[in-house]
Amino acid sequence: MSIPGFGAEAQVYSETGSKGLVEVAIPEGSEWRIEVPHKTILKFKVTEGVAEIFGTELPINVELQISGTKTMVYAPIIYETFKNKTVMSNESEEIVEYLSNDSVMANYINLHLVVEAMRQQVSDNNILNPTELQSGPRVLIVGNGNSGKTSLAKLLSAYAIKSDSTPVLVNLNPRDGVFSLPGSLTATPISDSLDVESANGWGFTTTSGSLFHNPKQPIVKNYGFVDVNENLDLYKYQVSKLGVTVLSRLEEDIACRNGGVIIDTPALGIKDFTVIENIVSDFEVNLIVVLGNERLMIDLKKRFKHKSALQIVKVPKSEGLVEVDEAFIRRTQEESIKEYFNGNYKTRLSPFKTDIDVNDHTIYKCVLSSDVNSALSFLPAEPSSSNLDNSILAITQLPSTHKSGRELLNTSILGYVHVSKFDDAKGKIKVLLPFPGGFPRNMLISTNIGFNE
């Protein structure tokens, strides 16, 4: 069967001898776009040639499983006379998949080459002039919702790894849990490939089981909400503190210094200019990439015309982007939380259940801007089953001997625990930890993130 737009010279889809398997030949420079619902699994493997998902190259003849995702497999090159191929197992009619040669990958690869050239220039300078060190590119990705910002961040990170660079990936979108849980802001040095089979396509952090990929170790700041507007003052403060941490890492680590920073953001427009301006200042951004919004690029150039060292470029967004509704987003968040504690089909983790006495711990809570006069604070929480059952608690690095909620603003997060039940009569909290052992007696923050096991 030939596919319109690809000519009639090749059989793009063909049945294989195995029951239910379909062979897909992906022409060079084309994409195999896939939409897999939650609770549905797509199994596939690359049989020959080269294929990648947002820059991460897929292994040959290794079965992969993905679920609850809208993604694409890209064929960048052809070996000899073969087409790039994958073999998929179509286990459900709910899976949407099709081939398209309408790809913007060439634009994204060119962007990577520009960023990599900046890294190489900085690296050469730092070798020749060790007393006058420079920093690599600090790239800020901005755009509307559903414009592909996270996909581009993955691609730039994956291609940087292929180029033997070690960038720091910064996630400023609390909706996504990048090597952490939703509600957090993270910064993670990336020196190993991403895990395309994980719930959000990033991978795991250091945890309680052996991993196929090197575990990532992020710095985590707690925001506690998934929408930046629920407490914008707290969001901007935590972004600023994360920026200080990242710049300090660049000062101490020459590999990260040369690799620079890649910053993913929530949906931001010109009305959010103060947020964008703060991010540019906090991370010393020198390259803004605007996805598919020429008006935003023009407005940003006008607003930042006083910053001669700041470059602003626009790249097109993919025509294959699919709108995701709130239900899909929430389900993805739930899957990432579940994976944080339990792992997935390939990586089984060993979470630990225990009871803790609420009187042995100090618990604070995140507050909405509308609830208090000063939104830049955490308030003491009054533990009860109504506000703790099926919730997520953040374990801070502050010992419980500290009694000031203001100190929580300047601390980072050790990890998260899930509260399944609080016994009001006994004052006992039943928690699930991602690691076995004693529960640290540190200050806790009750987030606005709920989860039912």
Swiss-Prot record:
InterPro entries: Clp1 (IPR028606), Clp1/Grc3 (IPR045116), Clp1_C (IPR010655), Clp1_C_sf (IPR038238), Clp1_N (IPR032324), Clp1_N_sf (IPR038239), CLP1_P (IPR032319), P-loop_NTPase (IPR027417). Its main location: nucleus. ATP binds at E31, K70, N146, S147, G148, K149, T150, S151. It is found in: Nucleus. Coiled coil: none annotated. One of its GO terms (biological process) is mRNA 3'-end processing. It comes from the Eukaryota. Signal peptide: none annotated. GO terms for molecular function: ATP binding; polynucleotide 5'-hydroxyl-kinase activity. Keywords: ATP-binding, mRNA processing, Nucleotide-binding, Nucleus. One of its GO terms (cellular component) is mRNA cleavage factor complex. The keyword Nucleotide-binding applies. Component of a pre-mRNA cleavage factor complex. Interacts directly with PCF11. Belongs to the Clp1 family. Clp1 subfamily. Required for endonucleolytic cleavage during polyadenylation-dependent pre-mRNA 3'-end formation. This is mRNA cleavage and polyadenylation factor CLP1.
